[in-house]
A protein has these predicted regions:
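A feature for loop-to-transmembrane-helix boundaries and adjacent hydrophobic helices
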Residues: 1-229
């Protein structure tokens, strides 16, 4: 991002300063997002909330969309204070987001989490997991790998768009949500550990992914069409 900062009209010092706030607060956002949809896990027997358990992130429970939302909020405030073009900064920031998400998914592999359902495909992943309290060997979809590769491909695609076809501030920002939303929506359907919308059968990340992708695509078409005319 620092290497390409000048092309987007952003100072390298502003990137470093923004990361100082965005990184820790994005972790907080990822945790709060997870807690929101699993609130019952953080209640004591008397119904009160266990705030100690809420802050123990080493026990698991971070959701990427919470981190993304918090990062956008932090960037908005930062740009307002520093009088920087938000959409230009956001265009630059999505490249770091994709790299971070691409690498971060391998943490799921190390922790043996965020995998998919059973499959017989040649690239299946063998794991030991507990099913109804019994430890069993399973061959499953390596959904962490799917998303990591999707982010890698998205990064390469957005780099080319930024170099050749970037027409307006916000184009890369919208392209990120369009690309990631579609991929996450389909991959989420394969996972076995999804967050669900308050007791329904609706997968939160799948819904959020498809909705944000649809909105982003519409805004891209409108903005590109307007500029072409």
């Amino acid at each position: 991002c620092c290497h390409a900062a000048k092309r987007f009209g952003i100072k390298q010092d502003d990137i470093i300063d923004m990361l100082f706030f965005a990184v820790p607060l994005s972790i907080v956002g990822a945790r709060l997002y997870y807690i929101l949809f699993y609130l019952d896990l953080y209640r004591r027997e008397d119904g009160s909330l266990d705030f100690g358990a809420m802050v123990r992130i080493w026990d698991g429970g971070l959701a990427i969309y919470g981190g993304v939302i918090m990062a956008v909020v932090v960037l908005l405030v930062f740009c307002k204070v520093r009088k920087i073009r938000f959409l230009a900064f956001a265009d630059l920031g999505v490249f770091g987001m994709l790299i971070g998400q691409m690498i971060g998914r391998w943490g799921n592999f190390v922790n043996i989490e965020a995998y998919g359902g059973p499959t017989e495909l040649p690239w299946r992943m063998g794991i030991y997991a507990y099913v109804d309290g019994v430890r069993q060997y399973m061959e499953v979809h390596p959904t962490f790998l799917y998303e990591s590769l999707w982010n890698l491909l998205g990064f390469a695609l957005l780099v080319q768009i930024a170099r050749r076809w970037r027409k307006f501030d916000g184009q890369m920002f919208l392209s990120y949500f369009a690309w990631y939303g579609v991929g996450r929506g389909f991959i989420e359907g394969l996972r076995t550990d999804s967050l669900y919308l308050f007791g329904t059968s609706i997968r939160v990340s799948q819904l959020f992914g498809f909705v944000t992708a649809a909105v982003a695509i519409v805004l891209l078409v409108v903005n590109l069409g307007f500029r072409n005319h």
